Amino acid sequence: MTLRSQSVEQSSPHQTAGFADSIKPQLQCGIQRALISVIITTYNRTDALNAVLRALAAQTDRGFEVVVADDGSDQQTAQLLEPWSASFVRLGHVWHEHRNFRAAEIRNRAILQSCGELCVFLDGDCIPRPNFIQAHRRLAEPGWFVAGNRVLLSRQLTERILADHLEPELWALRQWVEARLRGDINRLQPLLSLPLGPLRRLGGAAWRSIRSANLAIGRADLLRVDGFDAAFSGWGREDSDLVLRLMHSGTRRKDGRFATAVLHLWHAENDRSRLAVNDLLLHAAFRDGRTKAQIGLSSL
């Protein structure tokens, strides 16, 4: 059965008996050392989310749970998740009412509902390849977060993948070379697999250009900085703020390139009207050497 938690800021028109009403999400399990928690953000895009869940269900490493961090989708998302529940160790669904873009807050709610010692953040339009979990497990190390990367897919290729239920996560390199020649992907290099070894630690203090679309962080490191900062609302900079505070607290970056790349389905550009405000918040965190979120996990 899919486990669901709903933040009751006010009653939702999509509420059903399947939702457990709770103002403050409560952890539903003990922390499990070998378990990875994959936290997927989504908002009203069930076709893309279905492709992501399909790819996760076929992972070579099965020791993970999935918690869907739902920024206020309609009931179709809950209906999509129910049949997938048998495919994972545990499938959780954390929902709050949609009020602008609140990825930081819903990720925090999902963290509180997760059980793994390692949290892997993944966007609901980013398809992982079969060894995604295995690679993140291999790279995980206390005191280091792993910044993965992505390949951007064109609108035309995205529409074909979703309409025809294609499985690009299983494509051979030759198919990706052809896609690159057609202009259907922005780059090919992330799809190559390289060991890199100690070279992955060379950019330990680099915090720019890291995206929470593919980011792995130890639970202890997340708790130390109080998670994401829900002061960031609207699109942009909440992931940069988290990374910056992690580094201020002593956590360092490990490069996940050539090991953990995901396939980012095309979508229209998000509303960026709050970006200037979020830039100011990020600048303040940088200037003040802040480690703790202003509105973090402890506020829930």
Question: Which residues does each predicted region cover?
Answer:
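Cell-envelope/extracellular polymer assembly enzymes that use nucleotide-activated donors
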Residues: 35-37, 65, 241
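Acidic helix N-cap motif at the loop->helix transition within catalytic regions
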Residues: 50, 75-83, 131
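Short, acidic, metal-binding catalytic loop of nucleotide-sugar glycosyltransferases
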Residues: 54-63
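A conserved acidic beta->alpha catalytic loop
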Residues: 55, 70-81, 126
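Short beta-strand/loop segment that forms part of the nucleotide-sugar
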Residues: 63-75, 92-96
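Glycine-rich, basic loop-to-helix element that forms the pyrophosphate-binding segment
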Residues: 97-114, 131
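Short aromatic/hydrophobic "clamp" motif used to bind/position activated sugar donors
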Residues: 119
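Conserved donor NDP-sugar-binding/catalytic core segment of glycosyltransferases
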Residues: 131-180
